[in-house]
Structures are given as C-alpha cells and as structure tokens.
C-alpha cells in the first residue's frame, strides 16, 4: 500500500511553523509497512489543493491531509475534497451537537463558521475529535482512501493514534518490525565501512544508516507474515551489527545519550560534578534532562574566565600561563579541582575554542579537551571539531557525554 501526505496551510508553505505533523505521520505509516514516496505542502488555495489530490491519487492508495478543517473561510479542505469526488457536504448531526455543546458550555454563540465543521462529504466516515471542534473524516472512493485530519498536533496525534491507525491496520497484508540503534564516537564513513557488507547484501531485514545532529542511527527493518516472524528476523541482524560496532552503540530507539549516561551513573551509584568552559552549561543542561539525576549530579559550574578556573577549581595560574586555558593540563586540573571541591566520585571538565575567533595554528578553532577524573584517576581526551560556534559547543557536549560513558564502562566500576 502506498500513501501520500499533503500538509495544508499557508503558514507551513511560508515556513512560519515547522511541519511536525508530516514527520509524525510518515513514521507511523512506516511502522505499518505503508510506503510513503511523496509529501507536499499546499497553501490555503482550493485550486492547488484539487490539483494536489489529482496528482496524489494517480500514484497512491491512501492520501492523508492535515489542516484546513477550521471555521474560517480559508479552511476549505472538506469543500475541496467534496468537489473533487463530486459529493455534497451534508450535516453530521452528532458532530453538530457536540460543537453546539462545546460553545454553549463556554457561554459562546455558535456561528456559521463553527457549524461548517460539522459538515462532511456524503458517505464519509466521521472521526470524532475529543481535543477540538474539528472532527476528522475518511472518504473511500474507487479503492482509494482520503483521510482528512486537523492541523494542530495536539488534536491530530491522539486522533491518529486512536482512530486512524486501527483503521489502516485492517488493510495490512504484512507485519513489520523495527529496531533503531544509536551510535556515537565514530564518523559516518567509519561506521559504514564496518558494516558495508551487511548493508550491501541486505534483503529482509534491511539496514539503513542515518546521520543526525547528535550522532548516527542504524534502522533495522524486517517484514513477515506474522508479527512474531518479523520480530524474530531483527535479532540476528542486531547481534551482527553490535559485534561490529561494540561500544560505539550506546542505546536503542528514542533513548538519548544523556539518559544512558544518567542511568549508568545512578545504577553504579557514582556521584558527578561538572566544570565547563566552552560549552557554557550545555553539558549540565543535557544531563539534567533526565529525571532522577539529582541523586548523583551534585554540582555544575561554568568557569569561563581564567580567573574563575583559578578561584573555583584551584587551577594553578602558572599552568594556564604556560600551557593556555585550552590545554590538556588545564582540563586535567579542572576535572580534579571540581571533583575535590564537590567531593564526588567523578569530576568532568571541558575547555576549548568554540570560535569564531581566537584560534591559531597550534590551537585551531574546534580544539577541545575533556578531563575525566574518576576516584582519583584522571584521563584527558583531545577533540578536533568543526562547524559554527554553537555546532562546536553542541558536538563537544555530545562527545563529552560519550567519553564519560565509555570511561565508566571500560573501567568496570
């Protein structure tokens, strides 16, 4: 089965809001094994939307739209769909009653714009919207399906999960299973080289690598005549990939690197304190995203100036004078200093040059040192990163979390 997504709204077309609906729907359809080959964004224009329907139904079995179901004149998705299929818009009494009750309960009058939300192309399957006044609907015509959904994600997502997914599952002829492996610490080329023979000879399951801002992912997908069959095909492929990539794989599916690190620290009862310079609080911010981290995260401090490194971390001024603030030696003293002052098992430090100015030949922009002091034993890692100032800071944060993860696991603490 092939599906196409049409997102409706001039605000989307002009880039005024981000189109998260299409991303969500595409992922959900993929989980059902429904192929999505095309997506489009159409402004609030009846002619262009009708043309989009014409094109979409020539190549797709299911067309899903979001937006254009509101009470205003430029909300014309249902009107365009009715015209496209040669159908009339007719009242749906249950929806009209709910709309009237909604406004009456708030002491408001129902106008014609509100009432039109209770009208649908004749023969439609109406899907109630418990989170808004715009019900969705499904139109079935000539073995094709048009699904009209509201635009606000807080309305669209619950409606899709509870009503659209069960509807689409009735047409499944295969079952699908997916596993996403999250990778950090190696480049895309290095990862691809390590698993190239697997990728080249894939049939079922398939393996697809993706680059993301904070790392890489590998998506394993399998199909079968039953869900159990599809699930069982994933495991051998996953084991093969894990054997190749080892500790470079830090987690699965939607789990974040900071969540993995937090869980390791909590499980091993390792307290941590952090001293940041170039990352300016990014590192502490990422770690406190995880609920429960307060049981092990004792202290975080941004020591941006040389004076603050000396004052709060006890870094020797002569070390800074001799080696510079961005150096292995200063990163070491920062990590040991925060560990000592906070009385924690782990002291973590980051110092570097994020740019855009200040670099030189022996210390270029993107040079970062990470200090990790664990129970009195300190290691320092050098990173050479590229990109904008914020990109370097973000990458430094990610790599620091990953280096901490590896150090703790390698030491078998």
Curated annotation (Swiss-Prot):
It holds the Pfam family CinA. It comes from the Bacteria. Gene3D superfamilies: 3.30.70.2860, CinA-like, MoaB/Mog-like domain. Coiled coil: none annotated. Disulfide bonds: none annotated. InterPro entries: CinA, CinA-like_C, CinA_C, CinA_KH, Competence-induced_CinA, MoaB/Mog-like_dom_sf, MoaB/Mog_dom. Belongs to the CinA family. HAMAP family: CinA_B. This is Putative competence-damage inducible protein. It comes from Alkaliphilus oremlandii (strain OhILAs).
């Amino acid at each position: 089965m092939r599906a196409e997504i049409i997102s409706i709204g001039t605000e989307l077309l002009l880039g005024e809001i981000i189109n998260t609906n299409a991303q969500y729907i595409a992922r959900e359809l993929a989980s059902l094994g429904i192929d999505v080959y095309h997506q489009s964004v159409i402004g609030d224009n009846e002619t262009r939307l009708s043309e989009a329907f014409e094109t979409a139904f020539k190549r797709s079995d299911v067309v899903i739209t979001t937006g254009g179901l509101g009470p205003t004149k430029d909300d014309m998705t249902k009107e365009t769909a009715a015209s496209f299929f040669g159908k009339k818009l007719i009242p749906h009494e249950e929806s009209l009653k709910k709309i009237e009750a909604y406004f009456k309960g708030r002491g408001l009058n129902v106008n014609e714009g509100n009432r039109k939300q209770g009208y649908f192309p004749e023969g439609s399957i109406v899907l109630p919207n418990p989170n808004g006044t715009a019900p969705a609907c499904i139109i079935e015509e000539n073995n094709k399906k048009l699904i009209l959904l509201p635009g606000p994600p807080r309305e669209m997502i619950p409606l899709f999960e509870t009503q659209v997914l069960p509807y689409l599952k009735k047409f499944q002829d295969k079952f699908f299973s997916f596993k996403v492996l999250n990778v950090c610490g190696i480049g895309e080329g290095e990862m691809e080289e390590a698993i190239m023979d697997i990728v080249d000879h894939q049939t079922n399951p398939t393996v697809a690598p993706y680059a993301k801002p904070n790392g890489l992912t590998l998506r394993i997908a399998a199909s079968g005549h039953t869900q159990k069959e599809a699930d069982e095909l994933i495991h051998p492929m996953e084991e093969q990939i894990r054997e190749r990539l080892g500790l470079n794989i830090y987690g699965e599916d939607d789990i974040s690197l900071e969540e993995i690190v937090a869980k390791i620290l909590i499980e091993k009862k390792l307290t941590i304190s952090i001293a940041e310079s170039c990352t300016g609080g990014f590192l502490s911010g990422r770690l406190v995203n995880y609920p429960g981290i307060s049981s092990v995260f004792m202290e975080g401090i941004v020591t941006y100036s040389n004076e603050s490194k000396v004052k709060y971390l006890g870094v020797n001024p002569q070390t800074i004078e001799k080696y510079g603030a961005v150096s292995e030696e200063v990163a070491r003293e920062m990590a040991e200093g925060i560990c000592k002052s906070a009385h924690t098992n782990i002291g973590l430090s980051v110092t570097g040059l994020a740019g855009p100015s200040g670099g030189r030949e022996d210390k270029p922009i993107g040079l970062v040192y990470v200090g990790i002091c664990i129970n009195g034993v300190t290691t320092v890692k050098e990173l050479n990163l590229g990109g904008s100032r914020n990109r370097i800071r973000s990458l430094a944060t990610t790599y620091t979390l990953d280096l901490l993860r590896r150090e703790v696991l390698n030491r078998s603490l």
